[in-house]
Regions:
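Bacterial N-terminal signal peptides that target proteins for export
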Residues: 1-8
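C-terminal motif of bacterial Sec signal peptides marking the signal peptidase cleavage site
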Residues: 16-19
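N-terminal mature-domain "stem" immediately C-terminal to a signal peptide or N-terminal signal-anchor/transmembrane
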Residues: 21-91
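Acidic/His-rich structured neighborhood in mature extracellular/periplasmic domains
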Residues: 90-167
Length: 167
């Protein structure tokens, strides 16, 4: 009888814990995202080389601030809300030199594991010196040789096209 009583108590505790969504894991909000370069450049390349409108939609959905910064501030093609901005953006990159640059950047930076490893190592060293610094989001882009690094409030954009050339 005593065992049955213990089983009922344990079952009730498990039921109440799951009903209250009791977590045995650490708070998910406090876990930092892994530090790596987000591949915005791949979406950009897909749109600019194939004209795939779904890639542009995904750029606007997944990277709205980055897309606005690229189109409005870096390339200065107009505002993101212009009716014809997608066509203007696509036509800007139809130059054969820029198309070759996109293809070269895509080939050169197909794998960024070494860059991500160095980034983690460097940022960990920076956090040792400045423990209160918040981890920004790093993303790669193609910027038509305009800027090498773009700094936002909580993001750092790396223009891969500026890092092409002889090693």
């Amino acid at each position: 009888m005593k065992n049955l009583y213990h089983i009922i108590i344990i079952a009730a505790l498990v039921l109440l814990s799951s009903a209250c969504e009791f977590k045995f894991k650490p708070n998910e909000e406090l876990v930092a995202e892994p530090l790596c370069v987000q591949r915005y450049d791949r979406l950009e390349s897909r749109y600019l080389t194939t004209g795939d409108f779904s890639a542009l939609q995904q750029m606007n959905t997944d990277y709205p601030i980055e897309t606005r910064t690229l189109i409005e501030k870096m390339l200065q093609l107009g505002t993101i809300t212009d009716a014809n901005i997608s066509n203007r953006f696509l036509m800007f990159f139809q130059d054969s030199t820029l198309q070759a640059l996109i293809a070269d950047a895509e080939a050169e930076y197909a794998n960024m594991d070494d860059i991500n490893k160095d980034l983690k190592k460097s940022f960990n060293r920076l956090q040792d010196w400045l423990p209160e610094i918040k981890q920004p989001v790093f993303y790669a882009q193609i910027g038509a040789l305009d800027q090498s690094i773009v700094i936002g409030e909580s993001s750092v954009g790396i223009s891969l096209d500026k890092y092409m050339g002889s090693k």
